């Protein structure tokens, strides 16, 4: 049942009034049920970001409740998989500035997230040593925003999260900033 709900929640485009109504009905019913799922092992977790993101297109006041439930399941999944949070009592500096690690989604020159956030991140370099972390989609313009850029190379979510944690620990990051959450699995999992 949860897999079917994931599949029905994931499309970006809902082309008929009837389909829109059905998705809205699911958004009212599903969060409470989703919150009871122990982990992501038996649901199509590869489309979790679609469930997370596309609820925003509904009109109900509580349309985002599915995010809360999904976050609860993700957190349990991470902990069951052996995840431990980073020790944030050890903060470092680089050239007298605190370190800000920025986890990116779709941060390339032709995407709106680049256009809306690159100038503020460039300005943040005055007060922070800025480290960008992202995948191959981050183009040269996106990488140039940062003092340094690290490409996430992991082949699964745990390896990507561990790589991100290593970057934060090695540099004593004072801030982990995600300018967007929901277009990619990595940011959703990192927020948990």
Regions found by a protein language model. Give the residues of each.
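Non-catalytic membrane-proximal stalk/linker segments that position and tether the catalytic domains
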Residues: 1-99, 143-145
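Short N-terminal targeting/anchoring amphipathic segment
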Residues: 102, 167-183
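A short, glycine/small-residue-rich beta-strand->loop->alpha-helix junction that serves as a flexible
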Residues: 103-118
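Short beta-strand/turn micro-motifs composed of small residues
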Residues: 104, 134-136, 178
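Short acidic, S/G/P-rich loop/turn micro-motifs used as interaction or catalytic elements
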Residues: 106-110, 156-157, 182-185
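N-terminal strand-loop element at the rim of the active site
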Residues: 126-159
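Donor nucleotide-activated moiety binding/catalytic core segment of transferases
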Residues: 155-171
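Catalytic core of nucleotide-activated saccharide and alditol-phosphate transferases
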Residues: 176, 185-186, 190-192
């Amino acid at each position: 049942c949860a897999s079917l709900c994931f599949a029905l929640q994931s499309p970006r485009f809902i082309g008929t009034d009837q389909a829109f109504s059905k998705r809205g009905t699911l958004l009212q019913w599903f969060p409470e049920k989703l919150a009871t799922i122990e982990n992501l092992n038996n649901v199509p977790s590869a489309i979790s970001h679609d469930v997370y993101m596309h609820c925003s297109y509904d009109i109900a006041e509580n349309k985002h409740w599915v995010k809360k439930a999904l976050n609860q399941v993700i957190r349990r999944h991470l902990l069951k998989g052996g995840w431990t949070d980073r020790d944030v009592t050890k903060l470092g500096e680089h050239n007298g500035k605190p370190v800000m690690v920025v986890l990116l989604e779709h941060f390339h020159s032709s995407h709106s997230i680049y256009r809306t956030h690159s100038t503020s991140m460039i300005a943040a370099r005055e007060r922070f040593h800025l480290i960008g972390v992202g995948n191959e989609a981050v183009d040269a313009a996106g990488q140039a925003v940062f003092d340094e850029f690290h490409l996430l190379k992991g082949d699964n979510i745990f390896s990507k999260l561990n790589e991100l944690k290593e970057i934060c620990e090695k540099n004593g990051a004072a801030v982990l900033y995600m300018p967007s959450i929901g277009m990619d699995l990595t940011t959703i999992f990192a927020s948990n």
